[in-house]
UniProtKB/Swiss-Prot annotation:
Protein name: Cilia-and flagella-associated protein 96
Family of this protein: Belongs to the CFAP96 family.
Chain residue ranges for the region called Disordered: 225-251
Location of this chain's protein in the cell: Cytoplasm, Cytoskeleton, Microtubule organizing center, Centrosome
Cellular component, GO, one term: cytoplasmic microtubule
InterPro entries reported for this sequence: CFAP96
Organism: Bos taurus
Amino acid sequence: MPAEGGKTDMERIGLFSEMEYITVGDKYVSQFNRPFNESASKNRQILPGGSKEMSNLQAGYFDPHFVRIFEGESYVNPNQVRRRYMMEEAKKNLSKAFLPSNGEKKPCGLGSYYGTIGGPVPFFSAQSKPKEKYEPPGKNLYTNPGKKGTGYGYANITIGKQFSHSSDLYDAAKLNNKKENEEHRRLLKGTAFKLNLYTREYFDTNPYMSEKPLPPIKKVEKKETVGNPFKPSSPGKKAGGMKAGTFDPYPSHSADPYVVKLKSPSSKSAKVFHPPGGPKSRPIESIMALNVKRALNMKNYKTASVQSY
């Protein structure tokens, strides 16, 4: 038996271990690029075993190929079953068309007079009947002749008389404006009234306003000040070492602990927790190696020409 938390020899060899579990849609990763113990660094740690999906590989079974469970059970082909059903349904179809026993019966529904007492009415017959030639009636008497148009472009058709033509002067508007200006100037009495006295202002003058020019502005002389030389700040204090330049004095040494640590009672009888193991690896042979093993044997290894991929 292995030590506590270890693996058995069968689990280390991996030939008779439990079948591998895979998920749908995972891409194939070669064993050279696959990291060692990937489950210890990715995803959540120390999880109990959940639902697993069995793989479709044949490595976990005793037989190399799948064997039928029941003896004498045959393979069912869905295409063959569907074709047999179609053939059985085709046998139900009749070769000849269906013929009635008593022949065709005359219709006696809407529009038919078969079986009635009086028979067909000649008035409702669909045949064409001779008709007399149509003569349209004459027009009524007119009391007044029709109007000629709407009046525009037609002479002497309106209620009143036509307007007589009267020619206008070429400068009629200019002459009328001139007459109005002359009449306006005739009504004027003289020129505009002008007062010969000194004009006085409506408000008093501003007492705070002076017409004298202001004196020039005196410029204040600035004294040149010589600044102190630049002095960089002192570097940051480091932990440890001499503390003479700090604000507070260095604390004195104290041998007493700040908090007394309590001893936790340990129960040696309790079992040690071991996390569940990760996925187990199996030795899988490459497809290229299988191709080489099948193509080369002890009989044709001298004359064989294997295609390289």
